[in-house]
Amino acid sequence: AAGCYDGQYTGDYFAEHGYVVLSIDALFWGERGRKEGVNYDGQQALASNFLQMGSSWGAFINMDDVRSAEFVASLPFVDKDKVGCVGFSMGAYRSWMLSAITDCIKVSASICWMNTTEHLMTLTNNQNKGGSAYSMLIPNLRRYLDYPHTACIACPKPTLFFNGSRDKLFPIEGVKDAYDT
């Protein structure tokens, strides 16, 4: 947050205002990275190993998030009917995915991560460079559902999606198509 978001740590802000906050880095991101540093080659190697074991890095992250939400909801001082999640960028993807795959989450906000596969699977987009893109891939899911379809599973609950018009990772045409889905 030091270089982004005006230096405001969202979790700290919520905690200072009385909310219970659990902020978990995805495996191979932030504090759960490698001691020698995280790079795209290492992330791709991790993803490859998950696939060889019949799973995926993306599925692991999703289940890690579900277990984290279940833990928060189980705390005696937490109202399990008021558990929510919020995320920016990769965290936004994790937020809407988490809300879609567990009833533990009652409300979510996702800032700057929504698009369609058609607009992300281009030669110049970050999604095709490997590395961290594998953290969001669930084998065979795109065969049935695109990103906005998956996100819509969360939408019977209060759900906020917010995207910027100049986000270099998410072409505005794809954002508009996703919102029209």
What does each model-found stretch correspond to?
Residues 1-63, 68, 73, 119-122:
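Cap/lid segment of the alpha/beta-hydrolase catalytic domain
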Residues 25, 86, 111-112, 162:
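Alpha/beta-hydrolase-fold catalytic nucleophile elbow
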Residues 44-45, 49-53, 67, 106-151, ...:
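Mobile cap/lid helix-loop segments that gate and shape the active-site cleft of serine hydrolases
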Residues 77-89:
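Alpha/beta-hydrolase fold nucleophile elbow
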Residues 87-97:
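Glycine-rich nucleophile elbow surrounding the catalytic serine of serine-hydrolase chemistry
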Residues 100-106:
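Conserved hydrolase catalytic core segment
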Residues 154, 161-163:
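Short beta-strand/loop motif that positions the catalytic acidic residue
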Residues 166-170:
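Acidic catalytic loop of the alpha/beta-hydrolase fold
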